[in-house]
């Protein structure tokens, strides 16, 4: 009986804590690309603002104060958002602070308010982990009532199309293609309506000498871009309705690290194909990003073309960028002339012979029908076998290249591998999970005891629901 009483007492205290002292969630207000959440420090109840990450959004936390009371608000950590509390259910002034950018370098945030009552954040295009960043805001006249400002990020499986010239390790890289500026290099990205494209020059390690003498060219890429290699034009005019993050405004003063990265959001409709570029420069070395923006994903096909004739074409055999430079994206019929001199030439020749023999067989003389039928059958079988053999060899070669490329990417992610035909495989678009060096398995996040029991959410409202259900079940069992 005594044990049961003690157990009931602790359960009551637990419920009292979460019912009587839980924060009041505040609704968010959306205006254009802004999502705004406000807490009132003069309130007698602890309020909580939660903003879920969404790329393309700008988040604004307002720690409102009552100027009539002439009180001053206090923010913890004092350097929010450079330092924050991470994944705390109910942080307080004694909770450990962490350097936000060491844990999550992709967060773009700043505070330029003289009274420290407004905090700006950009939604990030990629997150390698589930994580919550928390700052506290309260009035000096009510220090016991601490209001919560929380930014919540969910793990994403796909990285963003783009070029990272910062020599970053996979866990700190949010773009698909990695390069190091120890030599001149180039990176080719093929983009389509609705895509998000990024470029980064910065090595995401604080005070790393790699970041000395860095330069983004143009310095406000993608707001301005190079067209035809040397003509500086506005992306708004080249790609109407596109949007660049961060935008050129006084809302957020970018840190040094975030001054060397940029993203462009392509519109859902693109009327013209266009080739643009930006570059990263480190000392005498330049890494150039070539961005091929297409009106649709099927730039090599047209309504008059047979899809079967185009389907075997593969980036490992012929570069789409080369076709673009030669103007072939506007005249797909010329592609067949290139293919005839390419690695899969025999496959097309045999298929052409097969089709012509099939059509000619219907015009043969009836007296030679049997002989012609046998010859046609033999030739069809012979050519068909050769075609199948060449097709299988083609697929096998592609598979070997992909396996070899994946192996090299896992062991040395910044190596620049070229296959037998001289095509730089590492510069082609590819999505992959963060991986250990030399290990094909994805990185695994360490989970706490409570996350193993109740999931990875850091919201104590969800934890409270679980405990409430468990408490009711226990009471029910005790009363039986």
UniProtKB/Swiss-Prot annotation:
Lipid sites, type GPI-anchor amidated serine: 457
Composition skew (Basic and acidic residues), residue ranges: 377-393
Pfam families tied to this protein: s48_45
Propiece residue ranges: 458-480
S-S pairs: 37-49, 63-137, 80-135, 163-187, 201-280, 221-278
Position of the signal peptide: 1-22
Biased composition (Low complexity): 406-415
GO cellular component: cell surface; plasma membrane; side of membrane
Domain 6-Cys: 23-156, 159-298
Glycosylation positions in this chain: 28, 40, 92, 111, 184, 294, 368, 375, 392, 405, 409, 424
Disruption of the gene: reported phenotype: Cells lacking both P36 and P52/P36P show attenuated infection and do not form a parasitophorous vacuole within hepatocytes.
PROSITE patterns: 6_CYS
Entry's localization field: Cell surface; Cell membrane
SMART domains: s48_45
Region (Disordered): 358-415
Taxonomic superkingdom: Eukaryota
Keywords associated with the record: Cell membrane, Disulfide bond, Glycoprotein, GPI-anchor, Lipoprotein, Malaria, Membrane, Repeat, Signal
Membrane-topology annotation of the record: Lipid-anchor; GPI-anchor
InterPro entries: 6_CYS_dom, 6_CYS_dom_sf
Biased composition (Acidic residues): 362-376
Function: Involved in sporozoite infection of hepatocytes and replication therein.
Name recorded for this polypeptide: Sporozoite surface protein P36p
Taxonomic placement: Eukaryota, Sar, Alveolata, Apicomplexa, Aconoidasida
């Amino acid at each position: 009986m005594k044990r049961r009483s003690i157990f009931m007492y602790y359960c009551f205290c637990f419920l009292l804590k979460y019912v009587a002292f839980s924060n009041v969630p505040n609704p968010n207000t959306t205006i254009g690309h802004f999502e705004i959440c406000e807490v009132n420090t003069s309130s007698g109840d602890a309020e909580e603002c939660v903003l879920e990450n969404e790329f393309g959004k700008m988040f604004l936390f307002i720690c409102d104060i009552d100027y009539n009371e002439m009180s001053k608000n206090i923010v913890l950590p004092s350097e929010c958002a450079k330092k924050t509390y991470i994944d705390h259910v109910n942080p307080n002034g004694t909770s450990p602070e962490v350097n936000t950018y060491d844990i999550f370098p992709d967060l773009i945030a700043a505070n330029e308010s003289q009274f420290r009552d407004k905090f700006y954040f950009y939604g990030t295009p990629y997150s390698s982990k589930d994580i919550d960043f928390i700052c506290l805001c309260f009035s000096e006249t009510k220090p016991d009532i601490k209001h919560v400002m929380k930014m919540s990020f969910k793990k994403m499986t796909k990285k963003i199309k783009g070029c990272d010239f910062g020599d970053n390790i996979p866990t700190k890289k949010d773009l698909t293609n990695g390069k190091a500026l120890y030599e001149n290099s180039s990176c080719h990205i093929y983009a389509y309506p609705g895509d998000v494209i990024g470029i980064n020059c910065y090595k995401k390690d604080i005070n790393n000498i790699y970041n000395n003498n860095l330069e983004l060219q143009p310095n406000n890429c993608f707001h301005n871009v190079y067209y035809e290699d040397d003509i500086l034009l506005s992306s708004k005019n080249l790609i109407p309705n596109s949007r660049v993050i961060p935008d050129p405004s006084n809302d957020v003063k970018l840190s040094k690290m975030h001054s060397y990265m940029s993203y462009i959001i392509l519109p859902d409709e693109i009327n013209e194909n266009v080739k643009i570029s930006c570059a990263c420069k480190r000392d005498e070395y330049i890494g150039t990003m070539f961005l091929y923006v297409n009106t649709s994903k099927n730039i090599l096909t047209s309504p008059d073309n047979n899809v079967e004739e185009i389907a075997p074409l593969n980036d490992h055999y012929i570069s789409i960028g080369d076709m673009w430079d030669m103007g072939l994206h506007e005249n797909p019929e010329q592609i067949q002339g290139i293919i005839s001199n390419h690695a899969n030439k025999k496959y097309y020749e045999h298929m052409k012979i097969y089709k012509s023999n099939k059509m000619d067989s219907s015009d043969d003389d009836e007296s030679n029908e049997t002989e012609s039928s046998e010859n046609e059958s033999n030739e069809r079988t012979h050519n068909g076998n050769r075609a199948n053999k060449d097709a299988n060899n083609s697929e096998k070669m592609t598979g070997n290249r992909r396996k070899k490329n994946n192996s090299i990417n896992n062991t040395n992610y910044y190596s620049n591998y070229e296959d037998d035909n001289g095509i730089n495989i590492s510069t082609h678009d590819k999505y992959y999970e963060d991986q250990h060096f030399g290990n094909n398995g994805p990185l695994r996040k360490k989970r706490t005891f409570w996350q193993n029991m109740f999931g990875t959410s850091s919201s104590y409202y969800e934890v409270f629901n679980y405990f409430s259900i468990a408490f009711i079940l226990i009471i029910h069992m005790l009363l039986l």
